Amino acid sequence: MDDQNIRLNIAGHARYEYSEVARSYVPMHWHDALELIYILSGELTVETEQRRWQLHAGQCICISPYVLHATISLFGNTALLLQIPTEELGDFAPETRSRQFIWDVETTNPTMTAAIERVKQKLLQMQHTASSDSPFRDIRMASLLLEITYLLYEEFSCPVTEGSIFRREKNRQRLSAVIAYTEAHYRENIALSDAAATLHMHPNSFCRFFKENTGVTYLNYLNEYRLSKVHEDLVTTDAALHEILEKHGFTNYKLFRHMFAERFHTTPGRMREELR
């Protein structure tokens, strides 16, 4: 079986994917799942509210559930992806809610380095198994999923307090409401007061809350989301740039040019030429 862009559901809900992309850009988002990304070739930049990682071949990152993150690859990559939903994590270990996962891509700690290597080896075994024609492939994939989950809990998880759990879940519910509102209305002229109203907060309090919990301002998040939609249409359609900008609510052309150059290190016209 060909490896290219294989996607499999494991044990019902977990998702494995072998992916080859020429370039990609996904704005700030989160999953109701723990996510592992293992770069086999190429590069990928991962940004969270706390840090920015430039991943290259052989590096692997673990992103905890509900952690806002963005990914961008300017030159493409080949990667293995595994997403384990929190519901499934809870089935394996009921105390999931009271634990968090700590994974340092650039660690020099020998114990953590060895543990990361073991996880990477299991992911490579998943790749080999997923591309096989064995009638027992699904059994082996489920077995590897359990082994990886065990390693994640045993080597990378630590307990959190009840107070931290309460604050985290309350903030997650609030952010979910804001993100849902933004995705539904981003084409419109959204004011800070509009977004703040979704949480019944004063705009100043809302700005502090959003920045503290995402690492970016709300307006930056909104425009990054618009930029991702513009980028998607730019590389998949022949529509004129001004039509795409109007479609996705990007009315400030100067800001768009600045953000596009900062994010992609090129111009919209050059990007389209490179894709032809």
Task: Set out the residue ranges of the language-model regions.
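Basic/polar phosphate-binding segments, predominantly the helix-turn-helix DNA-binding elements
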Residues: 183, 189-227, 239, 245-274
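Generic structural signal for alpha-helix termini and adjacent loop/cap motifs
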Residues: 42, 129-132, 155, 185, ...
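Short, Lys/Arg-enriched, Trp-marked, Pro/Gly-tolerant hinge/linker segments that flank
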Residues: 104-117, 130-141, 150-180, 184, ...
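A hydrophobic/aromatic-rich effector-binding and dimerization subdomain
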Residues: 1-20, 65-132, 149-161
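Generic protein-terminus/edge-of-domain signal
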Residues: 1-60, 67, 73-75, 94-102, ...
